[in-house]
């Protein structure tokens, strides 16, 4: 798949200089046309990581964490090749997004 067409939950390399994580997770669905994609950094685990806000991923037999709280929009030109898919972790990723966007516990009244 060409780097210009990343799909939802693809894990890709990037071309962002000075960025701390080796990979980005595509959070924006591929059917939404845009010149950028909403992504979350994928980094090595840090002490104190909370599973719901930093779900675990395994890429090439190495454990990483998705930094959902650090999601941002990145131009398509900054996205490089696909290295894996996080489809098997979709439930954990969506739970983290739900908590960030809707509060904890999910569905808690405002």
Predicted regions and their residues:
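C-terminal terminal-subdomain/extension
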Residues: 59-110
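Intrinsically disordered, low-complexity and often Lys/Arg-enriched segments
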Residues: 1-7, 106-110
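Compact nucleic-acid interaction/catalytic patches
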Residues: 2-3, 11-57
